[in-house]
């Protein structure tokens, strides 16, 4: 069969795109020809990797580099869509020009099966796809989300489809009940999630992980409040939230207001995410509604028990409460905190639930879900008496994925394993190149071979895309007191290139806490490294643009810790009124500038956007100034002083 998927944008990030790619790849594995038509192209490359066997067709190119529309096309692009229902949330993004491009594609589509992936596109398929095609409408949300007006439009349109699929059985029941004329054509097929190639979490890390769009419906505010309740009893535990969205700023403000900035990190978007799930011991989901729960299955597949609200629709269908995780009433912060607390205090229960969760996640593999879709498509083709669909591709004719993405694994704090032959790999920094050592088809690089700074991983002399970066071993790196450095692999934001950040020194001042006490900023931390000097330490704040301007800080040290206090009212703007950037240092020698105070001993190579601190408005030099502590690009702690708005 030839199968075509019609999607809103392959170039965004989200569950619909990810599961469409998973299913498309599984169908290609079965020997079918697969293409994905994306209405919009908003960036150069998709955020998720696309199997080279899958053809991508772009209908509307909205990149800044795309040729400008002219004439009739430009006039149509300025008019709102007539094809896409106004009650569909994506309607404002569509135009008459997009309508024309969609209709043109559908009328010329030579596939055996065409699959829509959201209501507006399903309506377009029902109205304009050729009569001989098998037409499938996927529902990745749920019927109750659409409202009565859109529901009526869908009922009329969906009579022209051969099948409608939902990602939850509850939603399938809703369609059958409220759209009785198409009840026989409604099928429940869950989303697909590939099994991770990484070893599962050992659930001993003191980390809770949540992931998904940072939107109101995800109720991350409830998660923060529940974590705050648990954190008072278990201050060694941390929370990481992965994703981005419109509520990111609001969530940061809530974290700061709860005084959790040292324990809660907003990590941004990571792809693939399984290398992050394995760093946790508990997964948390606090949504009001989940049509499916892609992140739940991802976490389960990595061996994490999942604490989730029992919200409609997906979580109660996926999680067997007490076996693979725990379900709590939606909106009940105390119940959620109790569930977290129970797993935090019982490692054996975490381990048992994690193992059961990992086994249950096998239900959702792309091979299994792809086979369900293939069976549905074939049954609908047979019903149309179109049994001669051409020979399936044999295994030998299938394209194989290029070796573009490179996986890596942090063996420990100082050793990195690269998944490739050593004779093809190297690491480059400026004019310096280091060749890794090889063993059993893998390559190894060590801290002793690398200078401090950023290294680019090369394959055959060219930068390589990061695959799975399994750096979970680094999440416990701070416990080492005799280290001389750390090797942190990461994907470069924007390009996805595999980079390695190295910190290498005789000793380190590693930040553990930053807190405000009126106008004084207190920074505490650990002193690490075999070259740690003896004697009395002095902390300083130095103006970056004028190193002669130095403020001495109140400083205390003991055998392995330090504390400095900054009188922020003494800090000023830079000369000329620009932002004053003050770098914090610690020195045991009055004749030496010492070392920067920072935080480098974990898996976060770029901490500036993941670890934020509260800011303060005070008075310095007779004017209102905003004082903001932050981690600079090198993960060293600085203070930014600007004029208050």
List where the protein language model places each region:
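N-terminal strand-loop element at the rim of the active site
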Residues: 7-13, 26, 30-89
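A conserved mid-protein helix/loop that constitutes part of the nucleotide-sugar donor-binding site
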Residues: 17-22, 206, 210-232, 246-253, ...
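Conserved acidic donor-binding segment of nucleotide-sugar-dependent glycosyltransferases
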Residues: 320-322, 326-333, 342-347, 362
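Carbohydrate-associated surface elements
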Residues: 170, 192
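Basic, ligand-binding patches in group-transfer machinery
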Residues: 383-645
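Aromatic "clamp/platform" in nucleotide-sugar-dependent glycosyltransferases that forms part
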Residues: 269, 288
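Short hydrophobic beta-strand element within catalytic cores of glycosyltransferases
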Residues: 305-309
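A short, well-ordered alpha-helix in the C-terminal region of glycosyltransferases
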Residues: 335, 342, 349-363, 372-375
């Amino acid at each position: 069969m030839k199968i075509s998927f019609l999607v809103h944008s392959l170039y965004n990030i989200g569950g619909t795109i990810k599961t469409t790619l998973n299913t498309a790849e599984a169908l290609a594995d079965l020997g079918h020809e697969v293409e994905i038509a994306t209405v919009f192209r908003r960036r150069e490359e998709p955020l998720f990797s696309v199997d080279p066997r899958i053809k991508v067709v772009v209908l509307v190119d909205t990149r800044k580099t795309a040729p400008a529309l002219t004439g009739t096309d430009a006039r149509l692009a300025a008019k709102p869509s007539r094809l896409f229902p106004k009650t569909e949330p994506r309607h404002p993004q569509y135009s008459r020009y997009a309508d024309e491009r969609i209709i043109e594609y559908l009328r010329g589509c030579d596939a055996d099966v065409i699959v829509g992936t959201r209501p507006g596109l399903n309506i377009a398929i029902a109205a304009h796809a050729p009569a001989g095609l098998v037409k499938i409408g996927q529902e990745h949300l749920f019927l109750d989300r659409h409202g009565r007006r859109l529901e009526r439009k869908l009922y009329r349109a969906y009579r022209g489809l051969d099948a409608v699929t939902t990602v939850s059985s509850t939603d399938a029941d809703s369609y059958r009940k409220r759209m009785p004329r198409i009840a026989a054509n409604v099928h429940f097929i869950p989303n697909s999630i590939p099994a991770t190639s990484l070893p599962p979490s050992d659930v001993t890390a003191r980390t809770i992980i949540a992931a998904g769009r940072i939107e109101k419906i995800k109720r991350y505010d409830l998660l923060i409040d529940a974590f705050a309740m648990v954190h008072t009893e278990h201050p060694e535990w941390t929370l990481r939230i992965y994703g981005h969205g419109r509520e990111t700023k609001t969530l940061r403000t809530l974290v700061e207001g709860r005084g959790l900035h040292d324990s809660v990190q907003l990590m941004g978007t990571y792809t693939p995410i399984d290398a992050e799930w394995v760093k946790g011991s508990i997964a948390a989901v606090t949504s009001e509604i989940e049509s499916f729960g892609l992140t739940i299955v991802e976490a389960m597949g990595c061996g994490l028990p999942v604490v989730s609200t029992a919200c409609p629709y997906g979580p109660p269908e996926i999680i067997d409460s007490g076996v693979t995780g725990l379900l709590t009433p939606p909106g009940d912060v105390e119940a959620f905190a109790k569930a977290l607390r129970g797993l935090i205090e019982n490692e054996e229960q975490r381990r048992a639930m994690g193992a059961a969760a990992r086994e249950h996640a096998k239900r959702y593999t792309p091979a299994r879900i792809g086979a369900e879709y293939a069976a549905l498509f074939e049954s609908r083709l047979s019903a149309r008496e179109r049994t001669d669909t051409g020979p399936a591709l044999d295994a030998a004719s299938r394209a194989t994925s290029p070796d573009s993405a490179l996986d890596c694994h942090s063996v420990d704090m100082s050793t990195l394993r690269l998944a490739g032959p050593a004779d093809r790999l190297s690491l480059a920094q400026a004019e310096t190149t280091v060749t890794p050592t090889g063993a059993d088809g893998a390559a190894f690089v060590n801290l002793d071979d690398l200078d401090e700074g950023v290294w680019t991983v090369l394959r055959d002399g060219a930068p390589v895309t990061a695959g799975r970066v399994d750096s979970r071993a680094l999440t416990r790196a701070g416990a080492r007191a005799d280290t001389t450095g750390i090797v942190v692999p990461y994907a470069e934001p924007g390009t996805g290139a595999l980079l390695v950040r190295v910190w290498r020194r005789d000793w380190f001042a590693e930040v553990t806490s930053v807190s405000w006490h009126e106008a004084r900023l207190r920074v505490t931390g650990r002193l690490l490294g075999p070259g740690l000097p003896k004697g009395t330490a002095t902390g300083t704040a130095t103006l970056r643009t004028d190193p002669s301007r130095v403020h001495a800080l109140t400083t205390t040290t003991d055998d392995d810790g330090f504390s400095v206090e900054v009188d922020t009212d003494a800090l000023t703007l830079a000369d000329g009124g620009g932002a004053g950037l003050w770098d914090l240092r610690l020195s045991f020698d009055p004749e030496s500038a010492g070392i920067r105070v920072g935080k480098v001993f974990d898996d976060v190579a770029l901490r500036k956007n993941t670890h934020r601190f509260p800011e303060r408005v005070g008075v310095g030099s007779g004017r209102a100034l905003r004082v903001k502590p932050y981690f600079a690009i090198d993960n060293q702690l600085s203070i930014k002083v600007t004029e208050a708005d």
